[in-house]
Regions:
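A residue-level structural signature of the nucleotidyltransferase/glycosyltransferase Rossmann-like core
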Residues: 113, 144-147, 157, 185-186
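Conserved nucleotide-sugar donor-binding
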Residues: 143-154, 191
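Nucleotide and nucleotide-moiety/phosphate-recognizing core
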Residues: 8-142, 150, 171-180
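Conserved alpha/beta core of the MobA/IspD/sugar-nucleotide pyrophosphorylase nucleotidyltransferase superfamily
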Residues: 1-12, 154, 158-210
């Protein structure tokens, strides 16, 4: 699909990429559709991306793609089905970057991190200083969002497995941006983890996008 990064008239050459292609093996069902505050987990991630200064947004789907696309409000994001999703997160990342190849940079988030703050996205964008990648950290631990500059795209399209992209980042200049005060770095991999997020109260920060 040849769609400009600034699609929709957005003023940013930065694209948004939400990875949501996993099979939810540990969860036991399509966790992208599990509800938090009455909204599917994936929709929280998409709403958050839409509140940031970003142009085109792509969401990568794989397992259960048709059902997910029919039940989740994508908030203007373009769905891309990655045929290689079973090869791991790196394959999904490669599929998404191929769709956003004309962007000067791409901000990556995950579809199972509903509490990632829009301010975390703004913070990593504001931190651009020539580093190949900029990522949020929580209590010193690397997390998302991660901003990838265009110079990394080609190399990232060649990595494999769930750890491939992380290993590549070990070899380039990465700027870590502390986001401890914003919270939201938790993945939802199990039903117990979802219950724990529910117990913390409503998700805040990402206003609904009309």
């Amino acid at each position: 699909m040849n769609v400009p990064c600034r699609a929709g008239g957005a003023g940013s050459g930065i694209g948004g990429l939400v990875l949501a292609a996993g099979g939810s093996t540990r969860f036991g069902a399509q966790k992208q559709l599990a509800e938090l505050d009455g909204v599917p987990l994936l929709e929280h991630s998409l709403r958050t991306m839409r509140t940031a200064p970003i142009g085109r947004v792509v969401v990568v789907l794989g397992s259960g793609a048709e059902e997910i696309a029919s039940k989740v409000d994508l908030h203007g994001a373009d769905p891309v089905v990655c045929a290689r999703w079973e090869e791991g997160q790196s394959a999904s990342l490669a599929c998404g970057l191929a769709e956003l190849a004309d962007c000067e940079a791409v901000v990556v988030t995950l579809g199972d991190q509903p509490r990632v703050s829009p301010d975390a996205i703004r913070r990593v964008i504001a931190g651009r200083n020539g580093a190949a990648a900029i990522r949020a950290t929580y209590n010193g631990n690397p997390g998302h969002p991660v901003l990838l500059e265009h110079d990394l795209f080609e190399a990232l399209r060649d990595v494999t497995g769930d750890m491939g992209a992380r290993n590549l980042l070990l070899s380039v200049q990465v700027l870590d941006i502390p986001c401890d005060d914003l919270g939201g770095g938790e993945d939802v991999d199990t039903r117990d983890e979802l219950d724990a997020l529910r117990a913390r109260g409503p998700v805040t920060g990402a206003a609904p996008v009309e």
